[in-house]
Curated annotation (Swiss-Prot):
Its biological purpose: Involved in the control of epidermal cell morphogenesis in petals. Promotes unidirectional cell expansion once outgrowth has been initiated. Coordinately with WIN1/SHN1, participates in the regulation of cuticle biosynthesis and wax accumulation in reproductive organs and trichomes. Functions in cuticle nanoridge formation in petals and stamens, and in morphogenesis of petal conical cells and trichomes. Functions as a major regulator of cuticle formation in vegetative organs by regulating the cuticle biosynthesis genes CYP86A8/LCR and CER1.
Cross-referenced InterPro entries: Homeodomain-like_sf, Myb_dom, Myb_TF_plants, SANT/Myb
Biased amino acid composition, Polar residues: 208-217
Gene Ontology molecular function, alphabetical: DNA binding; DNA-binding transcription factor activity
Gene Ontology terms describing biological process: cell morphogenesis; cuticle pattern formation; regulation of cutin biosynthetic process
Name of the protein described by the UniProt record: Transcription factor MYB16
Gene: MYB16
Stretches assigned to the HTH myb-type domain: 9-61, 62-116
Amino acid sequence: MGRSPCCDKLGLKKGPWTPEEDQKLLAYIEEHGHGSWRSLPEKAGLHRCGKSCRLRWTNYLRPDIKRGKFNLQEEQTIIQLHALLGNRWSAIATHLPKRTDNEIKNYWNTHLKKRLVKMGIDPVTHKPKNETPLSSLGLSKNAAILSHTAQWESARLEAEARLARESKLLHLQHYQTKTSSQPHHHHGFTHKSLLPNWTTKPHEDQQQLESPTSTVSFSEMKESIPAKIEFVGSSTGVTLMKEPEHDWINSTMHEFETTQMGEGIEEGFTGLLLGGDSIDRSFSGDKNETAGESSGGDCNYYEDNKNYLDSIFNFVDPSPSDSPMF
């Protein structure tokens, strides 16, 4: 026991619309708007129910409706979406601009459905029918392509929906991470922050201290002075933090005097390293002595060099008790 149509209940006209009725409906809506569809037929002078007027306007008389034959792209879209969505014509119509769901449904039932049946494809499942041998009809290739296209389109639509959701979630997570993160400030001090302010004493910047073995001036070295001084020569590994400016200059002058005192020893050691003949003679003397063919003069020369090297090593690497602590 369903509801009886409103046209039967009220005794209104049914069936196809005439051009005169279409003109009355268009004229009234253009002048007054449709308003309430229930009261529109009486105001427009039509012997139709409100539902019939609404469907006539929505599916046929709207000015933005695309009329005419469906093109090939629209037919493929309808078949692919029908394989995915079934008879949900309103959802299919959203993918076809300016086409109504009623028009799409009519075109499916009158053209596309019959075409699939002739190709041996079930219009409901979009799969080849088992009872009809497709090879005998010569349509197996087209059916396979159509089935594959429908499956691919279904997978594509599902993938697009999934990617849209994931992209929205990633964008939200990135925004939350960006807003929650705060910049980290490092409070470490560089060696320049520990050095004294040399610019406060301009008369000291003009003092040039030259080393007998280096051409670097003291003003060029002041930017690269480390924050602490470690005496490697001491076996105890004593590390002294940077002293004030006056104490540091005194220690530097003391080291400069020590360097001048050892100038003669450094010259001898440099001559030993750079003198190719002396090195060759020392090594040749070592080899000849091992082989039992060395002369007395070479042995004496080798012993002198050995004693000389021992004295240099003792000077460079003194014992902890003799290490100067400035």
